[in-house]
From Swiss-Prot:
Residues 264-295 are annotated as: Disordered. This is G1/S-specific cyclin-D1. Keywords: Cell cycle, Cell division, Cyclin, Cytoplasm, Isopeptide bond, Membrane, Nucleus, Phosphoprotein, Repressor, Transcription, Transcription regulation, Ubl conjugation. Pfam families: Cyclin_C, Cyclin_N. CDD domains: CYCLIN_CCND1_rpt1. It comes from the Eukaryota. The keyword Ubl conjugation applies. There is a cross-link at K270 (Glycyl lysine isopeptide (Lys-Gly) (interchain with G-Cter in ubiquitin)). The modification Phosphothreonine is found at T286. The gene is CCND1.
Length: 295
Protein backbone atom coordinates (compact mmCIF):
# COMPACT_ATOMS: atom_id res chain seq x y z
CA UNK A 1 0.00 0.00 0.00
CA UNK A 2 2.85 2.36 0.86
CA UNK A 3 4.39 1.89 -2.59
CA UNK A 4 1.08 2.74 -4.27
CA UNK A 5 1.07 6.18 -2.64
CA UNK A 6 4.64 6.98 -3.68
CA UNK A 7 4.73 10.08 -5.91
CA UNK A 8 7.39 9.85 -8.62
CA UNK A 9 6.36 12.92 -10.60
CA UNK A 10 9.01 15.49 -11.47
CA UNK A 11 8.13 19.15 -11.00
CA UNK A 12 8.76 20.77 -14.38
CA UNK A 13 8.12 24.32 -15.55
CA UNK A 14 5.31 24.47 -18.09
CA UNK A 15 6.28 26.34 -21.24
CA UNK A 16 4.29 27.47 -24.24
CA UNK A 17 4.97 25.92 -27.62
CA UNK A 18 7.10 28.06 -29.97
CA UNK A 19 4.91 30.29 -32.13
CA UNK A 20 6.34 31.12 -35.56
CA UNK A 21 3.97 34.11 -35.80
CA UNK A 22 5.99 35.85 -33.08
CA UNK A 23 9.10 35.72 -35.28
CA UNK A 24 7.73 37.51 -38.36
CA UNK A 25 8.99 40.84 -39.68
CA UNK A 26 6.05 42.84 -38.33
CA UNK A 27 6.87 41.80 -34.76
CA UNK A 28 10.56 42.57 -35.29
CA UNK A 29 9.75 46.07 -36.58
CA UNK A 30 7.61 46.69 -33.51
CA UNK A 31 10.43 45.50 -31.24
CA UNK A 32 12.98 47.78 -32.92
CA UNK A 33 10.64 50.70 -32.34
CA UNK A 34 9.86 49.69 -28.74
CA UNK A 35 13.52 49.39 -27.70
CA UNK A 36 13.93 53.14 -28.14
CA UNK A 37 11.36 53.87 -25.41
CA UNK A 38 13.24 51.99 -22.67
CA UNK A 39 16.79 53.18 -23.23
CA UNK A 40 18.79 54.55 -20.26
CA UNK A 41 20.83 57.73 -20.44
CA UNK A 42 24.43 57.16 -21.52
CA UNK A 43 25.70 60.05 -19.37
CA UNK A 44 24.01 59.45 -16.02
CA UNK A 45 27.32 59.03 -14.20
CA UNK A 46 28.23 62.63 -15.10
CA UNK A 47 24.81 64.28 -15.09
CA UNK A 48 22.80 62.50 -12.38
CA UNK A 49 24.91 60.40 -10.02
CA UNK A 50 27.15 62.06 -7.43
CA UNK A 51 28.38 59.00 -5.52
CA UNK A 52 27.94 56.07 -7.91
CA UNK A 53 30.92 55.26 -10.14
CA UNK A 54 31.19 52.87 -13.13
CA UNK A 55 33.34 50.54 -11.02
CA UNK A 56 30.53 50.31 -8.43
CA UNK A 57 28.05 49.41 -11.15
CA UNK A 58 30.43 46.68 -12.32
CA UNK A 59 30.62 45.22 -8.80
CA UNK A 60 26.87 45.16 -8.22
CA UNK A 61 26.23 43.84 -11.76
CA UNK A 62 28.66 40.96 -11.21
CA UNK A 63 26.91 40.16 -7.92
CA UNK A 64 23.49 40.24 -9.62
CA UNK A 65 24.74 37.90 -12.36
CA UNK A 66 26.07 35.45 -9.76
CA UNK A 67 22.72 35.46 -7.94
CA UNK A 68 20.79 34.86 -11.18
CA UNK A 69 23.14 32.02 -12.17
CA UNK A 70 22.98 30.36 -8.75
CA UNK A 71 19.18 30.57 -8.72
CA UNK A 72 19.05 29.26 -12.32
CA UNK A 73 16.93 32.21 -13.42
CA UNK A 74 15.72 32.57 -16.98
CA UNK A 75 18.33 34.09 -19.28
CA UNK A 76 16.27 37.28 -19.70
CA UNK A 77 16.10 38.12 -15.98
CA UNK A 78 19.61 39.54 -15.56
CA UNK A 79 19.67 41.83 -18.67
CA UNK A 80 16.17 43.07 -17.82
CA UNK A 81 17.23 43.78 -14.22
CA UNK A 82 20.24 45.74 -15.50
CA UNK A 83 17.93 47.73 -17.80
CA UNK A 84 15.84 48.70 -14.76
CA UNK A 85 18.96 49.61 -12.79
CA UNK A 86 20.42 51.82 -15.54
CA UNK A 87 17.10 53.54 -16.20
CA UNK A 88 16.60 54.27 -12.50
CA UNK A 89 20.14 55.60 -12.16
CA UNK A 90 19.45 57.80 -15.19
CA UNK A 91 16.60 59.47 -13.30
CA UNK A 92 17.41 59.47 -9.60
CA UNK A 93 20.61 60.09 -7.59
CA UNK A 94 21.39 57.06 -5.39
CA UNK A 95 23.68 56.81 -2.40
CA UNK A 96 26.35 54.15 -2.79
CA UNK A 97 25.10 52.47 0.40
CA UNK A 98 21.74 51.86 -1.36
CA UNK A 99 23.10 50.49 -4.64
CA UNK A 100 22.89 46.84 -3.60
CA UNK A 101 19.31 47.39 -2.42
CA UNK A 102 18.50 48.83 -5.86
CA UNK A 103 20.17 45.88 -7.59
CA UNK A 104 18.25 43.37 -5.49
CA UNK A 105 15.00 45.21 -6.20
CA UNK A 106 15.67 45.19 -9.94
CA UNK A 107 16.20 41.41 -9.84
CA UNK A 108 13.04 41.05 -7.75
CA UNK A 109 10.90 42.88 -10.32
CA UNK A 110 12.61 41.31 -13.37
CA UNK A 111 12.05 37.81 -11.99
CA UNK A 112 8.36 38.60 -11.58
CA UNK A 113 8.25 39.61 -15.24
CA UNK A 114 10.12 36.59 -16.63
CA UNK A 115 10.02 33.71 -14.13
CA UNK A 116 7.27 31.17 -13.54
CA UNK A 117 8.36 31.02 -9.89
CA UNK A 118 9.93 34.43 -9.13
CA UNK A 119 12.64 35.15 -6.58
CA UNK A 120 11.33 35.95 -3.11
CA UNK A 121 12.22 39.04 -1.10
CA UNK A 122 13.51 36.87 1.74
CA UNK A 123 15.85 34.93 -0.55
CA UNK A 124 17.30 38.09 -2.06
CA UNK A 125 17.90 39.53 1.41
CA UNK A 126 19.91 36.42 2.28
CA UNK A 127 22.11 37.05 -0.77
CA UNK A 128 22.87 40.53 0.61
CA UNK A 129 24.10 38.87 3.81
CA UNK A 130 20.95 40.31 5.43
CA UNK A 131 22.23 43.86 4.97
CA UNK A 132 18.72 44.77 3.77
CA UNK A 133 15.32 43.75 5.13
CA UNK A 134 12.36 42.38 3.13
CA UNK A 135 10.24 45.42 4.01
CA UNK A 136 12.99 47.71 2.64
CA UNK A 137 13.05 45.74 -0.61
CA UNK A 138 9.25 45.87 -0.96
CA UNK A 139 9.27 49.63 -0.37
CA UNK A 140 12.06 50.07 -2.92
CA UNK A 141 10.02 48.02 -5.39
CA UNK A 142 7.26 50.64 -5.28
CA UNK A 143 9.80 53.44 -5.70
CA UNK A 144 11.36 51.65 -8.69
CA UNK A 145 8.19 50.86 -10.63
CA UNK A 146 6.79 54.35 -10.06
CA UNK A 147 10.03 55.98 -11.20
CA UNK A 148 9.97 53.81 -14.34
CA UNK A 149 6.28 54.70 -14.79
CA UNK A 150 5.42 50.98 -14.76
CA UNK A 151 7.09 50.62 -18.16
CA UNK A 152 8.60 47.25 -17.25
CA UNK A 153 8.30 45.22 -20.47
CA UNK A 154 11.60 46.54 -21.83
CA UNK A 155 13.31 44.94 -24.79
CA UNK A 156 16.47 42.96 -24.02
CA UNK A 157 19.03 41.46 -26.43
CA UNK A 158 17.56 38.01 -25.75
CA UNK A 159 14.30 39.07 -27.41
CA UNK A 160 16.16 39.59 -30.70
CA UNK A 161 18.38 36.48 -30.74
CA UNK A 162 15.56 34.12 -31.76
CA UNK A 163 14.55 36.47 -34.58
CA UNK A 164 18.08 36.42 -35.99
CA UNK A 165 18.48 32.65 -35.69
CA UNK A 166 15.09 32.00 -37.33
CA UNK A 167 16.25 33.93 -40.41
CA UNK A 168 19.67 32.27 -40.69
CA UNK A 169 20.09 29.23 -43.01
CA UNK A 170 22.01 27.27 -40.38
CA UNK A 171 21.69 23.70 -39.09
CA UNK A 172 19.71 23.37 -35.85
CA UNK A 173 22.67 22.00 -33.89
CA UNK A 174 24.72 25.05 -34.90
CA UNK A 175 21.84 27.35 -33.94
CA UNK A 176 21.81 25.84 -30.46
CA UNK A 177 25.50 26.45 -29.84
CA UNK A 178 25.35 29.97 -31.34
CA UNK A 179 22.36 30.72 -29.10
CA UNK A 180 24.17 29.51 -25.97
CA UNK A 181 27.31 31.52 -26.66
CA UNK A 182 25.35 34.62 -27.69
CA UNK A 183 23.35 34.48 -24.44
CA UNK A 184 26.61 34.36 -22.49
CA UNK A 185 27.96 37.36 -24.40
CA UNK A 186 24.74 39.30 -23.70
CA UNK A 187 25.12 38.71 -19.95
CA UNK A 188 28.77 39.75 -20.13
CA UNK A 189 27.85 42.97 -21.99
CA UNK A 190 25.24 43.83 -19.35
CA UNK A 191 27.99 43.99 -16.71
CA UNK A 192 30.03 46.52 -18.71
CA UNK A 193 29.03 50.18 -18.72
CA UNK A 194 30.40 50.74 -22.25
CA UNK A 195 27.45 48.86 -23.76
CA UNK A 196 24.78 51.17 -22.30
CA UNK A 197 24.98 53.27 -25.47
CA UNK A 198 24.21 50.28 -27.73
CA UNK A 199 20.55 49.35 -28.25
CA UNK A 200 19.56 45.76 -27.34
CA UNK A 201 19.18 44.79 -31.01
CA UNK A 202 22.79 45.76 -31.75
CA UNK A 203 24.13 43.93 -28.68
CA UNK A 204 22.18 40.84 -29.77
CA UNK A 205 23.43 41.07 -33.37
CA UNK A 206 27.01 41.64 -32.23
CA UNK A 207 26.78 38.69 -29.85
CA UNK A 208 25.45 36.36 -32.55
CA UNK A 209 28.17 37.49 -34.98
CA UNK A 210 30.90 37.14 -32.33
CA UNK A 211 29.65 33.64 -31.45
CA UNK A 212 29.66 32.50 -35.09
CA UNK A 213 33.13 33.98 -35.66
CA UNK A 214 34.64 32.56 -32.49
CA UNK A 215 33.27 29.10 -33.25
CA UNK A 216 34.78 29.27 -36.78
CA UNK A 217 31.48 28.23 -38.37
CA UNK A 218 32.14 30.35 -41.45
CA UNK A 219 34.57 27.80 -42.88
CA UNK A 220 31.79 25.22 -43.21
CA UNK A 221 28.95 27.61 -44.05
CA UNK A 222 29.65 30.61 -46.28
CA UNK A 223 26.64 32.47 -44.86
CA UNK A 224 28.41 32.64 -41.48
CA UNK A 225 31.53 34.29 -42.90
CA UNK A 226 32.52 37.52 -41.15
CA UNK A 227 31.44 40.12 -43.73
CA UNK A 228 28.41 38.26 -45.06
CA UNK A 229 26.87 37.63 -41.62
CA UNK A 230 27.56 41.21 -40.50
CA UNK A 231 25.88 42.63 -43.61
CA UNK A 232 22.88 40.35 -43.09
CA UNK A 233 22.42 41.27 -39.42
CA UNK A 234 22.89 44.99 -40.07
CA UNK A 235 20.08 44.85 -42.64
CA UNK A 236 17.81 43.02 -40.20
CA UNK A 237 18.24 45.63 -37.46
CA UNK A 238 18.60 48.54 -39.92
CA UNK A 239 21.96 49.83 -38.78
CA UNK A 240 25.29 50.70 -40.39
CA UNK A 241 27.48 47.58 -40.89
CA UNK A 242 30.51 49.44 -39.53
CA UNK A 243 28.65 50.23 -36.28
CA UNK A 244 27.76 46.56 -35.90
CA UNK A 245 31.36 45.50 -36.56
CA UNK A 246 32.55 47.97 -33.91
CA UNK A 247 30.07 46.49 -31.42
CA UNK A 248 31.21 42.96 -32.28
CA UNK A 249 34.85 43.95 -31.75
CA UNK A 250 33.94 45.47 -28.38
CA UNK A 251 32.29 42.20 -27.36
CA UNK A 252 35.32 40.17 -28.45
CA UNK A 253 37.64 42.56 -26.59
CA UNK A 254 35.48 42.31 -23.45
CA UNK A 255 35.54 38.51 -23.64
CA UNK A 256 39.30 38.46 -24.08
CA UNK A 257 39.76 40.85 -21.15
CA UNK A 258 37.45 38.79 -18.92
CA UNK A 259 39.27 35.56 -19.77
CA UNK A 260 42.63 37.18 -19.09
CA UNK A 261 41.47 38.52 -15.72
CA UNK A 262 40.02 35.13 -14.75
CA UNK A 263 43.29 33.39 -15.61
CA UNK A 264 45.34 35.94 -13.66
CA UNK A 265 43.06 35.67 -10.64
CA UNK A 266 43.76 31.95 -10.55
CA UNK A 267 47.51 32.62 -10.69
CA UNK A 268 47.93 35.94 -8.86
CA UNK A 269 44.82 37.66 -7.37
CA UNK A 270 46.79 40.82 -6.49
CA UNK A 271 48.07 41.34 -10.05
CA UNK A 272 44.55 40.90 -11.41
CA UNK A 273 43.27 43.70 -9.18
CA UNK A 274 46.00 46.05 -10.40
CA UNK A 275 45.18 45.37 -14.05
CA UNK A 276 41.46 45.90 -13.42
CA UNK A 277 42.23 49.38 -12.08
CA UNK A 278 44.05 50.31 -15.29
CA UNK A 279 40.88 49.54 -17.35
CA UNK A 280 42.63 48.88 -20.63
CA UNK A 281 40.42 49.21 -23.69
CA UNK A 282 42.28 47.37 -26.44
CA UNK A 283 40.17 46.02 -29.32
CA UNK A 284 40.92 42.46 -30.38
CA UNK A 285 42.40 42.25 -33.86
CA UNK A 286 41.21 38.66 -34.26
CA UNK A 287 38.11 37.11 -32.67
CA UNK A 288 38.64 35.20 -29.44
CA UNK A 289 38.14 31.48 -29.90
CA UNK A 290 34.98 30.98 -27.86
CA UNK A 291 35.43 27.22 -28.04
CA UNK A 292 37.91 27.73 -25.19
CA UNK A 293 35.19 29.26 -23.02
CA UNK A 294 33.44 26.98 -20.56
CA UNK A 295 29.78 28.02 -20.82
Amino acid sequence: MAHQLLCCEMETIRRAYPDANLLNDRVLRAMLKAEETCAPSVSYFKCVQKEILPSMRKIVATWMLEVCEEQKCEEEVFPLAMNYLDRFLSLEPVKKSRLQLLGATCMFVASKMKETIPLTAEKLCIYTDNSIRPDELLHMELVLVNKLKWNLAAMTPHDFIEHFLSKMPVAEENKQIIRKHAQTFVALCATDVKFISNPPSMVAAGSVAAAAQGLHLGSANGFLSYHRLTRFLSKVIRCDPDCLRACQEQIEALLESSLRQAQQQNLDPKAAEEEEEEEEVDLACTPTDVRDVNI
